[in-house]
């Protein structure tokens, strides 16, 4: 048998190597690379091109329309190279592979293949896993293994890797070869294993289906009769389903793990996978059968149960049967074929394992104790356990109509109440989380009126009670009441409050005065009334804050008046688009030190004098330039000097002696009446508002100027020493 399997594997490997035309597709920018298999003509063409050009795969790929360089290289090295050895493995090669695997491990196949001439990594890997691995069984196939392969293949199909997990020591390749070469023909043509599995089926099923309820209760401690309108929990109406499920679980009676097995943990994991696959098979068979699940409370198992034991108990609970009680009309319903494997049969093979034996000691198999339903705890809260369609439901929804029935526990008259759902509940139905009602907590943020008036269940997020805020003063007043403008908060942005999320169908019953966001709304008043002083715009605030952060607090620096004059000249020149000022040529050596302050003030006043172009508009008669220069004095600043145009004052010079100054003062006295007689007339063309304000041409400014001039005319200085300076 082993020799036959070996020859079949070698033949299959060789066939796969010769005719495996599936190559991984390499993406390229231009060539539409083909996914098709390599043809015989393409293989011959590759051989000729390699003989001619060598292993220059760029040149070789140019002769193919839809093949890339990588594809040509892969095809040559893996299939077409004459250096490849495709024959059977020799003893020397096998020994070399074993040594290299012990050295590099069972995953470095590319490195291992470099030490074996003519072999590639794929060949070395398959040789090790299929033949040279000491864990691989080379003995003949047993009938029990055939039964496992048959039942697993019927459930999972050609998933050989999953089936190999159920058979320790057998590889997926060997199982596939055994099925294709031997078992498939026997099962389909000769009826292999079908007679063996069906021989004991009629007597067992007939005895269990025709047994009385008391007999079922004595045999199965988890048997619970329910009402007739509720379908049974684990009833199968078709004999074929019973046969398939029984066949899938018949191998559980055989222990797969020995107590002295060095790979005991691995076997235990494989057994767990076996039970999980059986559970999936049962679920797949139950769903199309149309049977519904009975809602009931389950008992709490101890926390000391391991994960493996929980899987086993799920299997045990899934296959415990529930029968029906005859209906009220007295007609006996047709009993279906049911499947109820014994708990001892399932758990007996596990008693030989120390890990399972310690766990099984925690379970009392006494039927008297297990049949006492009053001893079980039936919680009304949801269990955090993972729910599967075949497990007893751990949760009772408040929306379910619960039915209670009295059950005889062990025939001694003790009754227990078992909760079951309404027959209108669909199969395996579990209400969504969003539809489950929750308990009403007294600490929710409800007003006393709402809490006392109705018992509405909140479906939104509870909101914390907010602290007192001065903004809540707006709640007390009516909408039409006058607001106190002195105590208003200086905020222009409304504060976003937390909204209570509620369903659209829920009516909002909170009084208007208690609304949470009522105090955070900006009142509709004029913003100009909220503050007297102007406020700095936000961009300037940000800029000032950045400057203070970088350079420290800002400080006011007094600038010389000459810089102010230059700024005013620049602004006026930009607005009027004319150069209205004529620079004076100053002779600093002619000015005494005591005149420095007076000259500075004169420069400031000089910038406020009208342009020379406005002389015609005013209609005034001005003096000659030489008369102005004679009447100008550096120590005196008469009022009439303000009305002298700028062009006539540019020839001012410093006097060298006091006598000359006195003479100029007398001339200035003669000039004053002439200047005082100047009448201001209305301008031909009205000035703009800005120019009128800047140049003092408004009506109020003209009146005040005339009154000031008349007032100053009454002042008669007695001497030059008694002159007083008037600084505007």
Curated annotation (Swiss-Prot):
Pfam families referenced in this protein's UniProt entry, alphabetically: Cmyb_C, LMSTEN, Myb_DNA-bind_6, Myb_DNA-binding
Domain of life: Eukaryota
Classification via PROSITE patterns: HTH_MYB
Primary location recorded for the protein, binned into one broad class: nucleus
GO cellular component terms attached to this protein's record: nucleus
DNA-binding region ranges: 57-80, 109-132, 160-183
Gene Ontology BP, a term: cell differentiation
Segments of this protein annotated with the region Negative regulatory domain: 296-534
Oligomeric form and interacting partners: Component of the DREAM complex.
Gene Ontology molecular-function annotations: DNA-binding transcription factor activity, RNA polymerase II-specific; RNA polymerase II cis-regulatory region sequence-specific DNA binding
Location of region: Transcriptional activation domain: 230-293
This protein's name: Myb-related protein A
Cellular compartment(s): Nucleus
Function statement: Transcription factor that specifically recognizes the sequence 5'-YAAC[GT]G-3'. Acts as a master regulator of male meiosis by promoting expression of piRNAs. The piRNA metabolic process mediates the repression of transposable elements during meiosis by forming complexes composed of piRNAs and Piwi proteins and governs the methylation and subsequent repression of transposons, which is essential for the germline integrity.
Key word Repeat present: yes
UniProt keywords, alphabetically: Activator, Differentiation, DNA-binding, Nucleus, Repeat, Spermatogenesis, Transcription, Transcription regulation
Keyword DNA damage: no
Domain (HTH myb-type): residue spans on this chain: 30-80, 81-136, 137-187
Renumbered residue ranges of the record's region Disordered: 1-31
């Amino acid at each position: 048998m082993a020799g036959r399997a070996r020859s079949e594997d070698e033949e299959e490997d060789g066939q796969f190597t010769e005719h495996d035309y599936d190559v991984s597709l390499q993406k390229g920018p231009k060539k539409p690379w083909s996914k098709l298999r390599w043809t015989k003509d393409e293989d011959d063409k590759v051989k000729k091109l390699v003989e001619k050009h060598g292993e220059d795969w760029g040149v070789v790929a140019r002769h193919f329309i839809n093949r890339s360089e990588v594809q040509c290289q892969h095809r040559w090295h893996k299939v077409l190279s004459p250096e490849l050895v495709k024959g059977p493995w020799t003893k020397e090669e096998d020994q070399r592979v074993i040594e290299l695997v012990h050295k590099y491990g069972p995953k470095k196949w590319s490195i291992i293949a470099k030490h074996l001439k003519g072999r590639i990594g794929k060949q070395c890997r398959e040789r090790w896993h299929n033949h040279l691995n000491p864990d691989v069984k080379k003995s003949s196939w047993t009938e029990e293994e055939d039964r496992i392969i048959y039942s697993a293949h019927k459930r999972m199909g050609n998933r050989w890797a999953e089936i190999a997990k159920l058979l320790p020591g057998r590889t997926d390749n060997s199982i596939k070869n055994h099925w294709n070469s031997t078992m498939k023909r026997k099962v389909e043509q000769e009826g292999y294993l079908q007679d063996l599995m069906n021989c004991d089926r009629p007597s067992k099923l007939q005895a269990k289906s025709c047994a009385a309820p008391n007999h079922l209760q004595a045999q199965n401690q988890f048997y619970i009769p329910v009402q007739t309108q509720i379908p049974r929990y684990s009833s199968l109406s078709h004999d074929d389903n019973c046969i398939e499920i029984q066949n899938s679980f018949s191998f559980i009676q055989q222990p797969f793990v020995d107590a002295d097995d060095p790979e005991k943990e691995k076997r235990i994991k494989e057994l767990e996978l076996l039970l999980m696959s059986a559970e999936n098979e049962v679920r797949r068979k139950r769903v199309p059968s149309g049977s519904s699940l009975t809602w009931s409370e389950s008992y709490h198992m101890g926390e000391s149960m391991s994960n493996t034991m929980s899987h086993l108990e799920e299997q045990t609970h899934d296959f415990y049967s529930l029968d029906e009680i005859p209906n009220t009309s007295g007609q006996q319903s047709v009993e279906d074929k049911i499947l109820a494997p014994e708990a001892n049969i399932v758990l007996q093979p596990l008693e030989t394992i120390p890990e399972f034996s310690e766990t099984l000691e925690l379970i009392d198999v006494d039927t008297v104790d297990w049949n006492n339903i009053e001893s079980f705890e039936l919680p009304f809260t949801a269990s955090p356990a993972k729910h599967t369609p075949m497990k007893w439901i751990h949760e009772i929804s408040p929306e379910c109509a619960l039915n209670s029935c009295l059950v005889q526990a062990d025939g001694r008259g003790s009754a227990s109440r078992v909760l079951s759902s309404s027959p209108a509940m669909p199969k395996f139905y579990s209400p969504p989380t969003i539809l489950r009602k929750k308990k009403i907590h007294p600490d929710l943020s409800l007003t006393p009126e709402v809490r006392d008036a109705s018992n509405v269940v909140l479906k939104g997020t509870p909101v914390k009670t907010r602290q007192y805020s001065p903004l809540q003063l707006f709640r007390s007043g009516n909408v039409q009441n006058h607001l106190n403008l002195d105590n208003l908060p200086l905020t222009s942005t409304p504060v976003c409050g937390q909204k209570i999320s509620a369903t659209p169908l829920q009516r909002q019953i909170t009084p208007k005065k208690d609304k949470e966001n009522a105090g955070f709304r900006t009142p509709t008043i004029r913003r100009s009334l909220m503050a007297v002083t102007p406020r700095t715009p936000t961009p300037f605030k940000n800029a000032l804050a950045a400057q203070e952060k970088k350079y420290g607090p800002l400080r006011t620096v007094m600038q010389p008046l000459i810089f102010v004059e230059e700024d005013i000249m620049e602004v006026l020149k930009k607005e009027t688009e004319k150069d209205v000022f004529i620079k004076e040529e100053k002779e600093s050596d002619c000015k005494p030190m005591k005149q420095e302050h007076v000259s500075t003030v004169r420069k400031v006043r000089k910038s406020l004098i009208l342009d020379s172009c406005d002389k015609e508009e005013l209609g005034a008669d001005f003096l000659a330039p030489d008369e102005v220069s004679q009447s100008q004095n550096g120590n005196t600043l008469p009022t009439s000097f303000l009305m002298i145009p700028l062009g006539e004052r540019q020839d001012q010079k410093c006097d060298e002696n006091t006598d000359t100054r006195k003479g100029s003062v007398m001339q200035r006295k003669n000039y004053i009446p002439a200047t005082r007689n100047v009448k201001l007339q209305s301008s031909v063309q009205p000035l703009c508002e800005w120019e009128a304000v800047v140049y003092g041409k408004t009506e109020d400014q003209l009146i005040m100027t005339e009154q000031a001039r008349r007032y100053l005319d009454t002042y008669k200085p007695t001497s030059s020493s008694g002159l007083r300076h008037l600084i505007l």
